[in-house]
């Protein structure tokens, strides 16, 4: 249902999706599919000759795909360097023009400057390099203190779709950071799915069944979330089964507002979250779409290097939803005005 919703929105307002890790047959196949289906306008960042030779050697068509070479676009790099200087001031490196020949940095600059709507990277680059490019070129949203991520977990056979956060960015979040992650994840879930988030703050304890500094950290984070978003349905600390299985919730957390029906799972650490999503993916029959990076001033998202063509396509569709929702809202308002 979620991917179908994203597909419908994409057909109404296709996004410009830039791929900096373009020398990858998975990206070429995904880009060709998005283009042929009218779901997006893919932009590949690479040397055109090198990319076409690569595509030819792998038997992948490139008909209709736009390719941009950072080395051959000095004017764009100069524009991006000027924007970088205006935003970062003295922190801008003296060799900014040269650094912008890097596909990751160039793609991040395209999104920051409005030359593309979404950047999808990470199929070849490490998460650290993707985040570094995002932070250096795009920067954080105004008021944002914590960069984080969320995976959209989609069932292949049965079960509900879920959000898993944070599985990629913050290793040992403080209570304040955990609260930031929960609030950002709730907002992302609502924007992408159109559903109200039901947030579970996970731990190895349910409602004080264990005492430990890690448990106290989750409890404190839950209170911060409640103070900052009193209308949000949130509970913690909870074990996964108490957050996900109504029958278990009735035993372990009978007073929980979630009643075992949480749809956004906030893990207490990166270690727990990363292990958890991979178990759900490899043993539980769930597809992992993402991670969607939360907190950057423009959308730049990170794939797992083990991603499939389908996962690249789905992340491109999902990542564009907030922008498409805004486009549709503006269109509706314009219609009302007219």
Swiss-Prot record:
Reaction(s) this enzyme catalyzes, per UniProt: acetyl-CoA + phosphate = acetyl phosphate + CoA
UniProt keyword list: Acyltransferase, Cytoplasm, Transferase
pH-activity relationship: Optimum pH is 7.8.
Xref: SUPFAM superfamilies: Isocitrate/Isopropylmalate dehydrogenase-like
A GO term for molecular function: protein homodimerization activity
Subunit structure as annotated in this protein's UniProt entry: Homodimer.
Main function: When expressed independently of the eut operon it can restore growth to a double pta-acs deletion mutant.
Protein name: Phosphate acetyltransferase EutD
Species classification: Bacteria, Pseudomonadati, Pseudomonadota, Gammaproteobacteria, Enterobacterales
